[in-house]
Amino acid sequence: KKYQIHLQNHYDATSRQVQKKEIKVLKKRKNLLIGEVFPYQICLESTMEYSRFMLWFEKEVQKIVKELWNQHFIIKLTLSQLHFRETILFLEHLKDFSKRITIEFIGEDTPEIKKHFSVQEQEAFFIGKLRMLKKWKFIISKHIEGCSVEQTLAFTPCLHEIKYTMSQQARMEENIIDLHMFIDFWEYWAIHKKLKFVVEVKEADFITKSLMHKKVHVQFENA
C-alpha cells in the first residue's frame, strides 16, 4: 500500500472533549511514513492516480465510519475537486453516513483544464455542487483563509459552518487588534446568517485564551 489512514482529533478548547476526527492520509515508502498526502495534489498531478486513490480512500472511509459508529468525521477537500467525477462518486457512496461527516473545503489550485471558465461560471458551478451536498445531508464547512471574502459570502447559503485556521506564522505577523476585528466580523456574519463560526488553532496559547474570553468557538488539533 502507498497510503495509510491517520485519524486526528479536533477538540473543543473549552470542554477539552473530542468533537470530530479528521480523516487524514499519510504516504508510505518502504513501510516508512513520509508525510501527509493531500488528495487535491494527486488530482492536479495525475487523473489516473487520483481515480485509483479515491477508490482506495472510499473503502477506507467506509470501514472507519462503520467501525466508529458514534463518531463525527472531517474530510478535507478543495472546491476544484468537485470538477472530477471520482470526487462526486466518492461522496455519493458516503451518503448513508453523511450526517456524521463534515466536508471542509480548503484553499486550492484550479485545474488547468478548468482555467478557461470565468470566475462567475466557476462560482455558479460550485454553488450547484454545494447545494447538492447539502441536500445529501453532509455538513458543509468553508475555510476562509486563502480565499476571497466575496467567494465565501457568495457560498454562504450553501454552508453550515465557516472556519478560520490560525497558523503560527499568522499569529506572529497579525496585529492582535486587527486579528480580533477580523474574528469579530466573521462572528457577526455567522450569527446574522445562522452559521457556526469556528476558529481552529494548533495548540492552546495566549491568543486562544483571548478568543475564548470573547466566547468565540475555538477548536484545537491533537495527533
Descriptions of predicted regions:
Residues 95-174, 184-223:
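The catalytic core of metal-dependent phosphodiesterases that act on cyclic dinucleotides
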Residues 56, 179-183:
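Conserved acetyl-CoA-binding loop-helix of GNAT-fold acetyltransferases
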Residues 44, 176-180:
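Short, conserved loop/turn and helix-capping segments at secondary-structure boundaries
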Residues 1-97, 188:
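Bacterial c-di-GMP phosphodiesterase EAL domain
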